[in-house]
Amino acid sequence: NIQYIGLLNKFFQKTNNLYYKKKLEQTVNFINSEFKNDFDLYGSAYDADSDGVEGKYYVWNYTELKNTLGPKFNLFAKKYNLTEEGNFEGSNILTETHNKLSDDEIKEISNTEKILLDQRNKRAKPLFDDKSQTDQNCFLLETLLFSSLVTDNEDLKQNTLSSINILEKYLSDKIFHCYQDTEIDAFLEDYVYYAS
C-alpha cells in the first residue's frame, strides 16, 4: 500500500488527472481508517484470511452483489467487470475496468460503493497485526506527508505531522524496530527510513 500511494503521488503530480487523485485519497483513507493502532501509529499488516478463507473479507459473490445492489447492479457490474465465475476462486475482487462514466454514473457508483463498504464492515475482519515497526511507519509517514502536499490536503498534513511527533517520542531515547509488547532492537532499514 505504501508504494502504491507513492506511485499515485507521482502520477497525480505529473498528470494532474483527478482520477489518480481520487484513487490516492481512497487509498490514504483506507490506510488511515484501517491501519491505525491504539498508539496512533500504523500497524504492520492484516492476515489474508478471515473465518479460515483467504480473501473472504474483500471478495464478493456475484449473487450476493446482485441481491444487495438491486437496480444499481448493472452499472456496478459494468464498471467492475463482474461475472458469475468471478476472478478469484469463484468470487469477484472488485477491480475497476471501466472508468469512462458520466457524472451521474460516477455519483451512483460512489453511492453503491458506500453501500458495499457498509455491508463489508459487517463481516468478520482478518486478524490485524497492530505492532508498530519503525521502518514501515517512517516510510508511510514520509509518503503520506508528500501526499498531503501533492493534493494540498491540510488535514492529512496535520494528522501526519501528529503521527510523526508520536513516533519521535518513541524514538527519542533509542531506536527500536518495533514497539508494543516487546522492544526489538533496530535493523539497518529502521535507521535508513528514520534518517530519510
Task: Describe the residue ranges of each PLM region.
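Glycan-recognition and catalytic cores of secretory/periplasmic carbohydrate-active enzymes
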Residues: 1-196
